[in-house]
Amino acid sequence: MKLFTLLLPALTSAHSLSTLLSTHPTLSTLHSLLKQFSLLDDFNTLANITVIAPTNQAYLDLANWGFNVSQIPAPVARALFQYHVLDGEWESESIIGKGKVVHTYLKPPVLTNVTAGAAVKLSSVDGTIMTESGLGVAGGVEDVNLRFDGGVLHTLNASMVLPHNITLTAQINGLGRFLELMNRAGVVAEFEGLKDVTVFVPHDDALEKADVGKMSKEQLASLLRGHVVPNRVLYGEVFGKKGGYKSSNGWEIHVGKTADGTLTVNGIKVVKEDVILYAGVAHVIDKVLVADRVEHKGDRSYLHLDAQKPLR
């Protein structure tokens, strides 16, 4: 815990968010930016919130990378700041292990297509509270549990990044093969236009094992739609409750959790959970979800995807 937290116990009592920002030695840049973009008064009226507050150094680091927040278009800046306001009060003691996916005050139609609000992952790693935002960008909390009238604030050593579409997210996360197949099947625009979506993305090695070379464009599109659950944002915490859902092509999708905590979809292991998207969430899986067989037009032969577990 930072020395500031220990030396200023008065800041644990009730006061406005504006007062907290103006008196904290590392938050003057955020305070100025919120005033510049006419958000400070709005944020002062909110209740039951958690503010993830990038420090002065975090904004300096951004500027050194060529991203000066004070110079970006106002709608984008406001969306970015709203993304740093979480729904509910999340003190550090409530964030354990993998933690939780929490919705923010960034709501549609601006720069998110998640009805409940764009999400952030909170976790605890070796005693440090961590955030994971769009594109998998991580940040570490410095000062924790600074109270104000509307809730609690944690300072962060980085600015969070807005969730992006599945195309850029797949590129950043090394899922280029899935993106390549999306382009080949002509479903990129379709997938990017979805709202409140869950996408199960096989990693590149899994897709390399799957013999999709003989599939027509239509068959490949159907296969990829089998990895998409529309109108349901299924974060990892949902898997423990188990449940059945329908994919975009009508396949049955069953999620669950094994005794050792491993998440599964139709019995296939999830190797990376809760990749935050502009329109929902993605999970990286260890195999391709397929039907028992896929009929080819013309010769009526069948394509089998090697080493894959069939859907039931």
UniProtKB/Swiss-Prot annotation:
* Matches recorded under InterPro entries: Adhesion/Biosynth-related, FAS1_dom_sf, FAS1_domain
Top-level taxon = Eukaryota
What is a single cellular component term in the Gene Ontology annotation?
extracellular space
Keyword Cell division appears in the UniProt entry: no
Q: Where is the FAS1 domain?
A: 17-160, 162-289
Q: In which pathway does it act?
A: Secondary metabolite biosynthesis
Entry function: Fasciclin-like arabinogalactan protein; part of the gene cluster that mediates the biosynthesis of elsinochrome C, a perelyenequinone phytotoxin structurally similar to cercosporin. The first step of elsinochrome C biosynthesis is performed by the polyketide synthase elcA which catalyzes the formation of nor-toralactone.
Protein name, per record: Fasciclin-like arabinogalactan protein elcF
What is the protein's species of origin? Phaeosphaeria nodorum (strain SN15 / ATCC MYA-4574 / FGSC 10173)
